A protein has these predicted regions:
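N-terminal amphipathic/basic-hydrophobic helices that include classical n-h-c signal peptides
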Residues: 1-19
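N-terminal strand-loop-strand beta-hairpin
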Residues: 19-138, 170-203
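Short loop/beta submotifs within extracellular cysteine-rich repeat domains
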Residues: 49-50, 160-162
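Short, surface-exposed beta-strand-loop junctions and turns on beta-sheet-rich folds
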Residues: 89-92, 148, 159-160
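A contiguous pocket-lining binding segment that forms or flanks enzyme active sites
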Residues: 142-146
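A generic "binding-loop/recognition-motif" signal
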Residues: 156
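Long, well-ordered alpha-helical scaffolding segments within enzyme catalytic domains
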Residues: 161-173
Length: 203
């Protein structure tokens, strides 16, 4: 996700964030039938369903990149490959703020070779099924991973707060860990890389 906007209103723990090319989002853990309830409410309030995608995400890192708090990610979605750099920005609020630069690339193999020459190796792989909704000024996504179900809202902090109120989801558990950090906790190590993949049916 990207293009988060950085204005915030005061009150309820919400203030003002710096203006920069950042991704601003909030993640929630989903249990039981909450996803169906929220999707029903999104439809009722006129949200636009933008479809579902399957992703394979590979995280690359190095000692120096970890020290800077950054990661590089290659994401494959169908025939599309995206190269992304992210770095977490600390704040005193309950949303995640990250500097993000992303571009589409044509040759994933060449990008991997370039990253290797720069000293960046793959450390994590996780698969994800993502359904996306456009709701007012924010993007609402439902993510299924091998280790759980989550929802994210991305936009301005004002927009996120408004969506929480309209969808009546303030009771949901907020998740501060990123998907890479959750993969590190719940994934399995294979050939030196921690992986979290869906189980495949059949032989």
């Amino acid at each position: 996700m990207g293009n988060g906007r950085a204005s915030r209103k005061s009150g309820n723990g919400y203030g003002k964030l710096r203006s920069m090319p950042t991704e601003i989002e909030k993640k929630y853990r989903l249990t039981g039938g909450r996803r169906m309830e929220i999707e029903s409410e999104l439809r009722r309030q006129g949200a636009e369903y933008a479809g579902e995608e399957f992703e394979e995400n590979t995280i690359f890192s190095s000692d120096s990149l970890r020290a800077a708090g950054g990661i590089v990610r290659i994401r494959r979605v169908g025939e599309t490959t995206l190269l992304t750099y992210k770095r977490r920005v600390e704040n005193q609020f309950d949303v995640k703020e990250q500097i993000e630069h992303e571009t589409e690339v044509r040759d994933a193999g060449s990008i991997r070779s370039i990253l290797a020459e720069l000293g960046l190796g793959p450390i994590l792989v996780y698969e994800k099924r993502r359904s996306t909704w456009k709701f007012r000024s924010v993007e609402v996504v439902f993510d299924e991973l091998a280790f759980g179900s989550f929802m994210e809202i991305e936009g301005s902090v004002t927009g996120i707060r408004e969506a929480e109120l309209l969808l009546e989801i303030e009771d949901l558990e907020t998740v501060h860990e990123t998907y890479p950090s959750l993969t590190a906790q719940f994934g399995s190590r294979s050939n030196g890389i921690i992986e979290s993949r869906f189980q495949k049916n059949g032989p």
